[in-house]
């Protein structure tokens, strides 16, 4: 990390939103899903930061990536070792300034951090859904997020923001609910996955599914966990999130013991790092959820319904766009972001594009990179609430209460 980045990281930690408390919205109206099934009822766990203005025109939705959740900023307790996953960007005086915006982040359906997913009880059976939880898509998530928006009494968002899989949700929001999105910020994303990215996801899924402790997804019934499979899936994913330059700078060919051991145990520092990332992930994530999230990635293709024409798919979009990519991101390369930009321009939309110099790879969207934060802060500061959706009302959907 450069001196500038280190100073920025220290500065943002001192400007936290503080202690935050997750909330749960309960919905009793069925949600029809793309797969043909429906959820008869469901819960969404979310957090909010900042204050909603009187006009209801300053709300911002944050969409999380594959392993993310609702806890985007602040701390749940004073003893927490780390803040939320995007605390560097959300808070007083930060790029997504909570002195100005009312920020909402939720755990998506199929998640494992409180929203309805494989770990939740299926009302039909009285047992956890497990592998019987329906396949969910990015469009399904956006429909559920729209209901949460209405539950909160909002008529729309000043901005919808997300990185990676979160950026795909932003793109889907702008297409599915064009009147509800004033600004769309798509970071390190793509209009659909390449064959290579689908292949990475399939290898990860096979690592989980072929683990003897997976039991067809019913590992809870056997008091088991597919630890090795989920660990391998995370190790593979983590390699794709980093760049060769970042791995060379951080690990090189360093040996843990200082000399070659001529064996198959961990010898190189990069091996140790990947195993740590894999084993720690197993303790905080669910294997069935991981399978669902990767499938949502694979299925995302908003142009498909428009004869594979992304320009046509974007025809009704009304949002202004900021699209951001990172030079060393090979999972979703800058060219994939430029595809989105070209399609937006061809459909006559307003779009700003920034390609950020970084050696952090795909994970750069989570980093405190000074120029990246200036771009994001500058864009957000120029949002005019006079042109954003406004209106605060009571909930449209029957929610069955919330805590």
From Swiss-Prot:
Primary location group: cytoplasm
Keywords: Acyltransferase, Amino-acid biosynthesis, Cytoplasm, Methionine biosynthesis, Transferase
Domain called AB hydrolase-1: residue spans: 58-366
GO terms under cellular component: cytoplasm
Xref: InterPro entries: AB_hydrolase_1, AB_hydrolase_fold, HAT_MetX-like
PANTHER family cross-referenced by the UniProt entry: HOMOSERINE O-ACETYLTRANSFERASE (PTHR32268:SF11)
Similarity section: Belongs to the AB hydrolase superfamily. MetX family.
Subunit record text: Homodimer.
Protein name (database record): Homoserine O-succinyltransferase
């Amino acid at each position: 990390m450069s001196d500038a980045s280190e100073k920025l990281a220290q500065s943002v930690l001192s400007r936290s939103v503080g202690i935050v408390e997750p909330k749960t919205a309960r919905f009793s109206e069925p949600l029809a899903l793309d797969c043909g099934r429906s959820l008869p009822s469901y819960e969404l766990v979310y957090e909010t930061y900042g204050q909603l203005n009187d006009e209801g025109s300053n709300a911002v939705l944050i969409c999380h990536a594959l392993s993310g959740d609702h806890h985007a900023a602040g701390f749940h307790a004073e003893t927490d070792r780390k803040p939320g996953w995007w605390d560097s960007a959300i808070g007083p005086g930060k790029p997504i300034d909570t002195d100005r915006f009312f920020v909402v982040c939720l755990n998506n359906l199929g998640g494992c951090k409180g929203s309805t997913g494989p770990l939740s009880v299926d009302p039909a059976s009285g047992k956890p859904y497990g592998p019987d939880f329906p396949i969910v898509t990015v469009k399904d998530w956006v429909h559920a997020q729209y209901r949460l928006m209405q539950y909160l009494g909002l008529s729309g968002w000043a901005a919808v923001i997300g990185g990676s899989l979160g950026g795909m949700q932003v793109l889907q929001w702008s297409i599915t609910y064009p009147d509800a999105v004033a600004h769309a910020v798509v970071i390190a994303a793509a209009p659909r996955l390449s064959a290579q990215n689908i292949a990475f996801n399939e290898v990860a899924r096979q690592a989980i599914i072929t683990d003897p402790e997976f039991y067809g997804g019913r590992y809870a019934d056997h008091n088991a966990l597919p630890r090795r499979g989920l660990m391998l899936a995370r190790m593979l994913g983590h390699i794709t999130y980093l760049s060769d330059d970042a791995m060379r700078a951080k690990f090189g060919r360093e040996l843990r013991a200082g000399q070659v051991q001529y064996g198959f145990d961990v010898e190189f520092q990069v091996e140790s790092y990947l195993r740590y990332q894999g084993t720690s992930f197993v303790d905080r994530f669910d294997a069935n959820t991981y399978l669902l999230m990767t499938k949502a990635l694979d299925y995302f293709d908003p142009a498909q319904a428009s004869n594979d024409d992304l320009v046509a798919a974007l025809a009704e979009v009304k949002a202004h766009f900021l699209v951001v990519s990172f030079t060393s991101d090979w999972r979703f390369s800058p060219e994939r972001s430029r595809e989105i930009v070209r399609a937006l321009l061809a459909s006559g939309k307003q779009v700003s594009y920034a390609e950020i110099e970084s050696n952090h790879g795909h994970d750069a969207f989570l980093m405190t990179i000074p120029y990246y934060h200036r771009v994001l802060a500058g864009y957000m500061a120029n949002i005019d609430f006079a042109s954003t959706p406004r209106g605060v009302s009571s909930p449209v959907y029957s929610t069955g209460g919330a805590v």
